[in-house]
C-alpha cells in the first residue's frame, strides 16, 4: 500500500510543505495498517492519534480518508473505508477481568429464574433488556435458535445444547414472553432482584449483569472471534467499546 502514496500525492495540487505533511502522515498510516485494510486496523489507527491536538487529529483523519478513497477509486480496495472523528476511543484498563469458572451456574438451584437470566447473559451475551424482551414465538428449540428483535435490528443467535433444558423448563405456560406474568413482561427491578439472589446463592455476590456479559466477551475472544464478529453478535453499532478486550 505504501507504493501508492507518491501516485496519490502527485494526483493532488499540493504545495511542497503540504506534500511533506501528506507523505509523513500517510507513511505513519501505512506502517500501522500494513497491506490489508480492515475495520480492526482502522480502529487501532484511530487509537494511535487519539491524544493528539484536535487540529492534528483532523488533519491526519482527512489525509487518511482521502487516501482510502483514492485506493477505492483505483480499485486497490474492494470496499470503501472511512475514519470519523466522532468515534470514542476507550481507555485500556490496566487489569482486564479474568474468565471465571461457570460450572456452578448450571447446577440445580431453587432460584431458577435468576439462573436462567444469568445463563442467557453468559451463553449469548444479552443485556437485561434483551433478556426481558425474549418472545416465546422467537424461540425455536428444535433448531436451537433465538431470533432477537430490538430497536437496533434483528439478530439470530444459536442456542447451545446445554441451554435447551433450562429454556424448556421455563417455557411451560408462557403466553408471549419468556419472563412474564399473564402475558406481561416483568419489570427491570424484578430481573435485577432475581439475578442478584441467584449469584449470591452460588457465592458470586456482586457479580452484575454487566460483568456476566463481560465473561461472554472474554470467552468469545478466547475462542477466536474477531472484534468485528463479536460486535455483530452483540448487536453493537460500533466495535469501539470492545477495543479494551483486544489490546494486549
Swiss-Prot record:
- Gene Ontology CC: cytoplasm
GO biological process terms, alphabetically, are: DNA transposition
Domain Tyr recombinase, first and last residues per copy: 85-248
Residues at the active site: 149, 213, 245 (o-(3'-phospho-dna)-tyrosine intermediate)
* GO terms of molecular function: DNA binding; tyrosine-based site-specific recombinase activity
Cross-referenced InterPro entries = CB, DNA_brk_join_enz, Integrase-like_cat_sf, Integrase_catalytic, Integrase_recombinase_N, Tyrosine_recombinase_XerD-like
User: Can the keyword Ubl conjugation be found in this entry's annotation?
Assistant: no
What task does this protein carry out?
Putative tyrosine recombinase. Not involved in the cutting and rejoining of the recombining DNA molecules on dif(SL) site.
Name the chain's protein: Tyrosine recombinase XerD-like
Amino acid at each position: 500500500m505504501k507504493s501508492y502514496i507518491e501516485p496519490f500525492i502527485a494526483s493532488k495540487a499540493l504545495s511542497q510543505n503540504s506534500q511533506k505533511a501528506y507523505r509523513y502522515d500517510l507513511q505513519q498510516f501505512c506502517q500501522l495498517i500494513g497491506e490489508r485494510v480492515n475495520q480492526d486496523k482502522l480502529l487501532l489507527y484511530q487509537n494511535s492519534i487519539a491524544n493528539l491536538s484536535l487540529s492534528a487529529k483532523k488533519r491526519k483523519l482527512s489525509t487518511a480518508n482521502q487516501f482510502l478513497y483514492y485506493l477505492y477509486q483505483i480499485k486497490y480496495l474492494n470496499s470503501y473505508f472511512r475514519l470519523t472523528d466522532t468515534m470514542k476511543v476507550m481507555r485500556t484498563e490496566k487489569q482486564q477481568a479474568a474468565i471465571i469458572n461457570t460450572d456452578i451456574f448450571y447446577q440445580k438451584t431453587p432460584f431458577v429464574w435468576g439462573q436462567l437470566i444469568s445463563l442467557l447473559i453468559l451463553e449469548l451475551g444479552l443485556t437485561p433488556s434483551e433478556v426481558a424482551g425474549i418472545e416465546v414465538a422467537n424461540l425455536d428449540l428444535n433448531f436451537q435458535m433465538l431470533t432477537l428483535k430490538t430497536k437496533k435490528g434483528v439478530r439470530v443467535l444459536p442456542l447451545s445444547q446445554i441451554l435447551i433444558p433450562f429454556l424448556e423448563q421455563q417455557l411451560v405456560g408462557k403466553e408471549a414472553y419468556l419472563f412474564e406474568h399473564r402475558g406481561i413482561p416483568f419489570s427491570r427491578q424484578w430481573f435485577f432482584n432475581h439475578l442478584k439472589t441467584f449469584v449470591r446463592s452460588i457465592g458470586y455476590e456482586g457479580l452484575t449483569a454487566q460483568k456476566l456479559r463481560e465473561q461472554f466477551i472474554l470467552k468469545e475472544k478466547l475462542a477466536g472471534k474477531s472484534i468485528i464478529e463479536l460486535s455483530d453478535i452483540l448487536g453493537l453499532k460500533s466495535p469501539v467499546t470492545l477495543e479494551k478486550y483486544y489490546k494486549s
